[in-house]
Amino acid sequence: MEVFPFLLVLSVWWSRTWDSANADSIIHIGAIFDESAKKDDEVFRTAVGDLNQNEEILQTEKITFSVTFVDGNNPFQAVQEACELMNQGILALVSSIGCTSAGSLQSLADAMHIPHLFIQRSTAGTPRSGCGLTRSNRNDDYTLSVRPPVYLHDVILRVVTEYAWQKFIIFYDSEYDIRGIQEFLDKVSQQGMDVALQKVENNINKMITTLFDTMRIEELNRYRDTLRRAILVMNPATAKSFITEVVETNLVAFDCHWIIINEEINDVDVQELVRRSIGRLTIIRQTFPVPQNISQRCFRGNHRISSTLCDPKDPFAQNMEISNLYIYDTVLLLANAFHKKLEDRKWHSMASLSCIRKNSKPWQGGRSMLETIKKGGVSGLTGELEFGENGGNPNVHFEILGTNYGEELGRGVRKLGCWNPVTGLNGSLTDKKLENNMRGVVLRVVTVLEEPFVMVSENVLGKPKKYQGFSIDVLDALSNYLGFNYEIYVAPDHKYGSPQEDGTWNGLVGELVFKRADIGISALTITPDRENVVDFTTRYMDYSVGVLLRRAEKTVDMFACLAPFDLSLWACIAGTVLLVGLLVYLLNWLNPPRLQMGSMTSTTLYNSMWFVYGSFVQQGGEVPYTTLATRMMMGAWWLFALIVISSYTANLAAFLTITRIESSIQSLQDLSKQTEIPYGTVLDSAVYEHVRMKGLNPFERDSMYSQMWRMINRSNGSENNVLESQAGIQKVKYGNYAFVWDAAVLEYVAINDPDCSFYTIGNTVADRGYGIALQHGSPYRDVFSQRILELQQNGDMDILKHKWWPKNGQCDLYSSVDTKQKGGALDIKSFAGVFCILAAGIVLSCFIAMLETWWNKRKGSRVPSKEDDKEIDLEHLHRRVNSLCTDDDSPHKQFSTSSIDLTPLDIDTLPTRQALEQISDFRNTHITTTTFIPEQIQTLSRTLSAKAASGFTFGNVPEHRTGPFRHRAPNGGFFRSPIKTMSSIPYQPTPTLGLNLGNDPDRGTSI
């Protein structure tokens, strides 16, 4: 420190001596440096000395210069010193100051037309912030920015995105202008990252002590979690002190990951920062190209650089600042521009300019000199130095260095990648050492049983449970690749985790927060609330909300045979049968047909109805209809019956083989609009919180989620919600309920249900994903995420998905119809109604038969005796009449009533053969004959009533016409009987004798 004032005085004297000694030089430049930029002045003088010794550039001309120092925060002083330099006459002005004074010098240079080469400098090595110099659109800006623009915010954003950080804290020192990362803060806020800011005071020890004194234990623990991810924007000296303090006070552990970003970090600073830190450290700094050939490190084209600046082993070169390098390259650039002007013989002499005089004119050669400088370019210590159209240097490169996770101090550091504005990030930031060193590591894994993500595959008493599922397959893939082992257990409360009133977490997330587990895996969705307390890998499967509903069951309709026609149509058909039967009877009654030989049926109303019904069911009828009107009626009826029966047959076949039972709920909107089926989800789950936040949003008051929340929140959520997913699935299967849950879980349940009784609906928008949860700041997250991405890229993840969610499962996921129903075979349920109708007919017929039997027995008890009710023995009468007809004088013979033997006849019983023949029914007729019986006998005649013949089962025939009988004449001919009296022969049934008609083929009658 005692030598420094002497050197300063010596340098000022040397500067004045140089100026006076070269007063006749035509090349003179001025320099303004910050008071703290002593190295800039030293490097500036070294650069001028190197160029004056190089005869190939300026040949016989020498560069002279004037240097002055100003307060970086005093713009007035900077302008005053610049005016003094312009008054001396300069070709260009070089400045290494802060942004405050740079703006004033920019205005002065523009006014006086003096090229101004500005090297931005920050205080004490603190990272730069953008100066924001105003650029004119008229291309009359005489200020050129030698240092590239500030790209720190772009580099930080790229690195943070690569590391997939979601929550971190930024520490910055008191000298840093926080506005320098305002653009970065805006971008991370748009991406949903949680970023905290904290200013680091100069007295770091006092700041740390204050934290311990003012924070409670819970707050201090949360602060420790925050420090696991941190970005340090401060000068190297402050960063070293801060890291030392937090490590010694145990505020950070080996699982922390810090990023230090500063352009001014040199190799010595890197080694010191790595030595003091624990955990993982990433360093971002500006880097410059170095020739691979050691012998060429100090040569740039035809110019040789002083070895004190280019030799990496030189102590001065090791501690140079970024601004020192740009100072040297600026002098080299000016020397080449002067050389160009001398060669082109377009030299403009220097002019003494006065800033004080009102009518002072700018330098006439300023524009030409500025264009020569802008078009030129050199290769120096910083690489290629050139200017773009906007007057800035676009060439910049950043180097990203990093260490591996570890507790030991003094770990090695390696280059992870590099960044530039053109190509972006080149390289991988993955911790390769961590990937290779997980062999033998045993991780404790917490899970929640959820099909098909995690399921118990084997549970043997006395042995650890074995698990299977999609998440277990993913975990095994990571384990096989990285080489770690794991022990798995189920969360004590079987929950995924939600925040409690006291700020703690329960469930799977709570196990990670309290550090009882290293990894949490199941059907765990990535949510902002969970990301605040734990870290997540990249998603390994997309997530969406679905609804599980019970497929509508096929109802057992015993009378499915009646389904093809509507009830009203059946009523019309039944009425039509009655109406047509009545019309047929009336038509035959109005115009009775002639009696046909051999026909023994009559057209009663009963027979007409029976005939119409028989023809309708295609069974035919017994009554012949010969009238034209009746036949036209029956023709129309048969056509009607043909169409109806054909339509019924076709419709019945289609109805019994294909049954469609479609549900009215096919989307979440349909579910929210109805109230017949209650629905809910798992209490305090991610789905529950998602619906709650959406439903309580005032901007979505009438939306789908608000309607869903009203249903889910009934009775404070206890009415329609369940405590775990399996309870919700069982509630759907055995009740009227819809379960809202993860679509992947519900699809697996629907696919593998033995009865195929479920179907799912849902939202296909994958706004979230399933991820592996780790402790906040876990060193394993990055390598896990990298491996998951590799599994997705090579298709292994899709293979695992198809294993648990096959495309062609045994059940249809989205159809509310039972697709397992066969279309060809009909079961007993489909025809149960037909058997019921048959059974009803049998029961009814048996009941009627019993009634008839009872009625006949009751009627038989009241039949009169033989003495009171006798009938004529028709066979005896037949023989007597035949004998009379063969007598010659029978026509004139008189006989008395007593000559006729009235013998009771029993016609109740008939021989078997006789019963099989068609026998006329005389119940509604009587036999009228013309006979020769004397009129005295006719008084005994009476009509054969239906009552008398009730036991004689004859068919119905038309009534015989009354007329005279013919009898055989003695000569064998026939003649009309002289007695033409018409009389009736009465008869009554007798229960004792049978009547044998037609057994004797030789028997005949003339009646």
Curated annotation (Swiss-Prot):
Pfam families: ANF_receptor, Lig_chan, Lig_chan-Glu_bd. Ca(2+) 2 binds at D753, D755, S757. It comes from the Eukaryota. The record marks F76 as: Essential for dimerization. Residues 588-635, 852-1007 are cytoplasmic. GO terms for cellular component: AMPA glutamate receptor complex; dendritic spine; glutamatergic synapse; ionotropic glutamate receptor complex; parallel fiber to Purkinje cell synapse; plasma membrane; postsynaptic density membrane; synapse. GO terms for molecular function: AMPA glutamate receptor activity; glutamate receptor activity; identical protein binding; metal ion binding; PDZ domain binding; scaffold protein binding; transmitter-gated monoatomic ion channel activity involved in regulation of postsynaptic membrane potential. Changing A654T: In SCAR18; constitutively open the extracellular-ligand-gated ion channel. Residues 24-345 are annotated as: Interaction with CBLN1 homotrimer. Residues 1-23 form the signal peptide. Residues 24-566, 657-830 are extracellular. The modification Phosphothreonine is found at T886. InterPro entries: ANF_lig-bd_rcpt, Glu/Gly-bd, Iono_Glu_rcpt_met, Ionotropic_Glu_rcpt, Iontro_rcpt_C, Peripla_BP_I. Residues 921-991 are annotated as: Interaction with AP4M1. Changing E61A: Reduces binding to CBLN1. Abolishes CBLN1 binding. Abolishes synapse assembly. Abolishes cerebellar parallel fiber-Purkinje cell synapse formation. Abolishes D-Serine-dependent long term synaptic depression at PF-PC synapses. The modification Phosphoserine is found at S883, S890, S1006. Changing D344A: No effect on CBLN1 interaction. Belongs to the glutamate-gated ion channel (TC 1.A.10.1) family. GRID2 subfamily. Tetramer; dimer of dimers. Interacts with EML2, MAGI2 (via PDZ domains) and AP4M1. Interacts with BECN1, GOPC, GRID2IP, SHANK1 and SHANK2. Interacts with CBLN2, but not with CBLN4. Interacts with CBLN1 (via C1q domain); the interaction is CBLN1-NRX1 complex formation-dependent; CBLN1-binding is calcium-independent; CBLN1 hexamers anchor GRID2 N-terminal domain dimers to monomeric NRXN1 isoform beta; promotes synaptogenesis and mediates the D-Serine-dependent long term depression signals and AMPA receptor endocytosis. This is Glutamate receptor ionotropic, delta-2. The lineage of its organism: Eukaryota, Metazoa, Chordata, Craniata, Vertebrata. The gene is GRID2.
